[in-house]
Curated annotation (Swiss-Prot):
Disordered: annotated span: 1-25
Native source species: Saccharomyces cerevisiae (strain ATCC 204508 / S288c) (Baker's yeast)
Compartments (UniProt record): Membrane
Domain STAS intervals: 676-854
Protein name per its UniProtKB record: Sulfate permease 2
PANTHER family: SULFATE TRANSPORTER (PTHR11814)
Length: 893
């Protein structure tokens, strides 16, 4: 039985060898024939081949003094750029140095000008205060007073959430509003007590108080809250001054929305007992689900306070609906023809909605005064706020009790995260809406300084409020200076209205809290958008809410933070590396989009891949183009062309020039290209691989495995393992198992070999070991256009990959790199011998080097717009580094 010889590879004829009878050929003979095959192949590799020539310049093969053949590709049409003798000017590319990095990225920040710029950035008010005018003042005054009217009742309500007396909420409000004006980069954010931070403060007070079972008189709730503000302020300011605000970006928006929704749900149910009048019967510091259960159990214990809670809550929602939705809709419907009246009613609705909290509290405070005046605490039918000290009490340097800071340590990370994330998320959101830039580092400084100054007034932690910031933006505030007017309103209330605050019903404050906090609950549209944008974000959001509700707010915060970091690491550790194929694409401008979806195949196409419309004649103003649809029907279409005059008085024809684009093979899934387009594989012996993330120690092993598996799958060995002695084969790749001679002579083995069923059940190999038609790997092109950085571990993995592939291919495989965007990545690659041929890893006699350079053309000026200067785009000393993926189909491989 005769057997055919080796496959025809690179037009090399391999002598056939015959096998007679059924005996196994001698290994020495096979090795001799294989050596002859390799010699013929190598000799043919260095022979110059005839190259075709056409209107576009083709390759010019040049044999170097070392015997390495280089081929040069002309990427420009000769009508555009003329390259003499297909040559490029020499350009020696150097590697980046530490001095260059210092000059480029560091030097400018260490100068006197840089120091002045830094100091100026700490006080943004310096940039806009000289331009302050009366129009800005009027807008800021109106917005500031409006926010002040909202801030007073809200700050007292949130102090109740924090289990603190009402005056501490007022202290935090006025000092936060004052100090933020001088450090802010957002004109809309309002600093003060907020719901989530107040809840966290209450948790901290409860935890720290539990650590003092004997009841130290110096460790009170206000002292713990002020100490927490001190520590949060120091850390926030330090992070801002050191410009480490990017750390806040590690937690994603969906994670922030998750724990804010869970916290809002916690606050809402925590205020229901006070709303109904049985607050002392329910432990509102327990897990949320327990609070819900206990609240429902004690519904029969409802008191008269429910009247002062449920009615205000109902009125607040009706008020919001009428003034925010239905009233403006009626105004637009019936007053659109009277612009002046329409504007008056519009602003009336707006300010009525903004003042709803204050008006409700004033009304029910009057009722509370009427029914509780002159009665003792036990005789009062409802719970009222009680005594609120007038003015600023105990102003001065705050002294921290010994040992208190260490007790706060375990609660500090969660508190800082709540303090920073909510504020940064709010400020950046309004910055996008109102078209101004928010500097996160400076915002951290503003929060830190505000809380540090607050310790002189016994304030508790304050940060940005979403509801007040939204109201401030709707008031058309112009500068952060409006905070001065808001703070003045709070200060005025502290000195003039504390007597009236005594009669505020606690149930009414709970109604205000529930009404304000309900806006923090994520709507079903937000939840559904998370699912549509990314299911993983949806899962993070839901799980964070559940953990916050069924465990604690701290656990929800830590889970959200860990989830965000885990997703970041997993995306880097498991990159979506892709092997690429090629397709010819072209840009068609001002094209007519046909309503049908048939695929068009142009019949008239020249040799350069340029499709043109067929000219119907010199006098004919219409030219016809034939195309073929996917239903195999020829359709003739008349395309009207614009009659631009040309020197030959002929109609200019549209030209579509195609170029090679490299696309992943799984483009049907990635939607990078029309799924009906067939991706052509690279030429034989070429693999193109795109890395989708930075090439680091986290993912280098995965890339190594993906590439080696693909190499072994689509290419054959340089030295077939069947033609090697068994003793020379590696233990981890010994080849197919063959039965020993004594086993083949046994009767049952012969019967097994002749049994059709056993042949069907025998393991099959994807490649015929007798005849392997797969090509030899010659070029591995790595697309580094998305690789921002690399490290020593990854570079060593790349060296190991080169060694393994060279050993598999039995030759030096060329490693080409495309689109390197970092000079440090290029420096690392060069240090490990990449960028050109490396004779250290293989015998030069089996290397066929291919050189390809990109050139760039630059117009010489307006005087000679048709003349260009041509430069070499990449270093000629590094021929394996490219700006774009070469068109390997044009290479002489």
């Amino acid at each position: 039985m005769s057997r055919e010889g080796y496959p025809n590879f690179e037009e090399v004829e391999i002598p056939d060898f015959q096998e007679t009878n059924n005996t196994v050929p001698d290994l020495d003979d096979l090795e001799l024939e294989y050596d002859q095959y390799k010699n013929n192949e190598n000799n043919d590799t260095f022979n110059d081949k005839d190259l075709e020539s056409n209107s576009v310049a083709k390759h010019n093969a040049v044999n170097s003094s070392k015997g390495v053949k280089g081929s040069k590709i002309d990427y420009f049409n000769p009508s555009d750029v003329s390259l003499y003798d297909n040559s490029v000017s020499q350009f020696e590319e150097t590697t980046v140095s530490l001095k260059e990095y210092y000059d480029h990225s560091i030097r400018s920040h260490l100068t006197v000008k840089g120091a002045c710029s830094y100091l100026k950035s700490v006080f943004p008010i310096i940039n806009w205060l000289p331009h302050y005018n009366f129009s800005w003042f009027t807008a800021d005054l109106i917005a500031g007073i409006t926010i002040g009217c909202v801030l007073v009742p809200q700050s007292m309500s949130y102090a109740q959430v924090a289990t603190l007396p009402a005056q501490y909420g007022l202290y935090s409000s006025f000092i936060g509003a004052y100090s933020y004006s001088f450090f802010a980069t957002s004109k809309d954010v309002c600093i003060g007590p907020v719901a989530v931070m107040s809840l966290q403060t209450a948790k901290v007070i409860a935890d720290v108080t539990a650590k003092y079972p004997d009841g130290d008189s110096a460790i009170t709730g206000p002292v713990i809250a002020t100490t927490l503000a001190l520590l949060c302020g120091i850390i926030s300011a330090a992070v801002g001054f050191l410009r480490l605000g990017f750390l806040v970006e590690l937690i994603s928006l969906n994670a922030v929305a998750g724990f804010m929704t869970g916290s809002a749900f916690n606050i809402l149910w925590g205020q229901v007992p006070a709303l109904m009048g049985y607050n002392s019967l329910v432990n509102t510091r327990a897990a949320t689900y327990k609070v819900v259960i206990e609240t429902l159990k004690h519904l029969p214990d409802t008191k008269l306070d429910a009247v002062f809670g449920l009615i205000p809550l109902f009125l607040l929602y009706v008020w919001k609906w009428w003034c925010g939705t239905y009233g403006p809709r009626l105004n637009d419907r019936y007053n659109s023809k009277n612009p002046r009246l329409h504007k008056i009613i519009k602003w009336t609705y707006f300010y009525a909605q903004a003042s709803r909290n204050g008006i409700i509290i004033i009304v029910f405070t009057c009722i509370g005064w009427a029914i509780t005046r002159g009665k003792s605490k036990s005789e009062r039918p409802i719970s009222i706020l009680g005594s609120v000290p007038s003015g600023l009490k105990e102003v001065g340097v705050f002294h921290v009790p010994p040992g208190l800071m260490s007790k706060l340590g375990p609660n500090l990370p969660a508190s800082i995260i709540v303090l920073l994330l909510e504020h940064i998320a709010i400020s950046k959101s309004f910055g996008r809406i109102n078209d101004y830039k928010v500097v996160p580092d400076q915002e951290l400084i503003a929060i830190g300084v505000s809380n540090l100054l607050g310790t002189f007034f016994n304030a508790y932690p304050a940060t940005g409020s979403f509801s007040r910031s939204a109201l401030k933006a709707k008031c058309n505030v112009r500068t952060p200076l409006s905070g001065l007017f808001s703070g003045s309103c709070v200060l005025l209330a502290l000195y003039c209205l504390t007597g009236a605050f005594f009669y505020i019903p606690k149930a009414t404050l709970s109604a205000v809290i529930i009404h304000a906090v309900s806006d923090l609950l994520a709507s079903y549209q937000t939840t559904w958008n998370f699912w549509k944008m990314n299911p993983l974000d949806f899962i993070c959001f839901i799980v964070t809410v559940l953990i916050t509700v069924f465990a604690s707010i701290e656990d929800g915060i830590y889970f959200a933070m860990c989830w965000s970091c885990a997703m970041l690491i997993l995306k880097v550790a498991f990159p979506a590396g892709k092997f690429l194929g090629r397709v010819e694409v072209a840009e068609v401008t001002d094209a007519y989009v046909r309503p049908d979806s048939d695929v068009v195949s142009y019949v008239s196409e020249n040799n350069n891949g340029i499709s043109t419309l067929e000219d119907g004649g010199e006098d004919d103003k219409e030219s016809s183009t034939k195309y073929v649809t996917n239903s195999s029907k020829k359709i003739e279409t008349n395309v009207q062309t614009k009659g631009f005059d040309s020197p030959s008085s002929s109609i200019s024809q549209p030209r579509i020039k195609y170029h090679t684009k490299w696309i992943p093979f799984d483009h049907k899934y990635t939607r990078e290209l029309n799924p009906d387009v067939q991706i052509l594989p690279p030429p034989d012996g070429v693999l193109v691989y795109r890395l989708s993330e930075s090439y680091t120690y986290l993912n280098c092993s995965r890339h190594y495995n993906i590439i080696t598996e693909e190499v072994k799958k689509v290419t054959r060995r340089g030295q077939l393992i069947r033609h090697r002695k068994k003793s020379d084969r590696p233990w981890n790749d010994p080849g197919p198992w063959e039965a020993p001679a004594f086993l083949k002579n046994l009767k049952f083995w012969k019967k097994r070999e002749n049994d059709p069923e056993s042949m069907e059940n025998a393991p099959s190999t994807s490649v015929d070991v007798e005849r392997d038609d797969r090509p030899l790997l010659k070029i591995l092109c790595l697309d580094f256009s998305q690789v921002a950085q690399t490290d020593a571990t990854a570079l060593q993995s790349l060296v190991d990959l080169r060694k393994a592939i060279n050993q598999y291919a039995d030759r030096q495989v060329e490693f080409h790199f495309v689109g390197i965007i970092s000079p440090w990545v290029k420096r690392g690659l060069i240090s490990r011998g990449f960028g050109t041929l490396n004779e250290e890893y293989s015998d030069e006699s089996i290397v066929a080097g291919h050189t390809s350079y990109h050139v760039a053309r630059v117009p010489q000026g307006e005087e000679n717009p048709e003349k260009y200067s041509v430069y070499t785009a990449s270093g000629t000393n590094l021929p394996f580094f490219h700006i774009d993926i070469p068109d390997f189909a044009k290479w002489d491989i």
